Structures are given as structure tokens and as C-alpha cells.
Amino acid sequence: MQMPAGRNILIVEDDESTLSGWVELLRSAGYLVTGVSSYEEGRQELATMPDLLITDVRLGVYNGLQLLMRGRMVNPQLQGIVVTGYADQIVRREAVYLQAEHLEKPVDADRLLQVVGNALRSPAAALRVN
């Protein structure tokens, strides 16, 4: 499979088995993927200007929504997928406000691939490629 141009993904997930599974899945689909397990590591990796951030909501003291907002300060076209292990309407509303997709764990592999593809085909993501 040919590598999608300009499709760099940063995954921030504190559960190591989930993180490694998502990294492997997305790499096998042809994406360039960096996976880290903490907010601090994610914040540092935002300097690499990923096209998409997939982040767990709960990341210790901070949360994935804060990380997405921080990333957009550097890269306004950064696409976001926020993942949580619990149903929370407040998190869902905040994700909608940030124009990010919201997924609940466990995330089906086909669903993750579909949501990632949609996020990277969005108009804001297209601005990064052109």
C-alpha cells in the first residue's frame, strides 16, 4: 500500500496495549504514526506538526482535550480524535466544540480506520496538503 502524503498521526494513549495496537493498525494502513503514553510526551511531539492527533481524554493531571487545544495553537489545521473509556456528555460536547471526533472505548479497528480516513480528508486537513 502506498503511503498517504502528509498523513502523520500522533497517538497519545496511556494504556500500552491499546497504544501499540492502534500504532500497528494505522502503520499497516500506510500512515506515519508516532505513539506516546503521556501528556508531556504528546506535548513535545506536537512540535513535529502531525496532521492528526488521536488522544485519550484522561492523561493524568491534564487531558486530551487540553492537548488538542495546545496543538492547535501551533497548528490550527490539526485534526483531532478524542477517545474515552466512559460515556460523558460533557466530553462529547467539548469534542464537538473543538470540531473533533469523539470515540468510546473499546474502538473497533474498522471504525478507527474509517474515522481516521474521514478526519484526514476533511477541508481543514486538505489545507495542509495543498
Walk through the language-model features, giving the residues of each:
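Two-component/phosphorelay signaling modules centered on CheY-like receiver
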Residues: 16-34
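The feature encodes the CheY-like receiver
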Residues: 60
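Acidic, metal-coordinating helix/loop segments flanking the phosphotransfer/catalytic sites
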Residues: 34-52
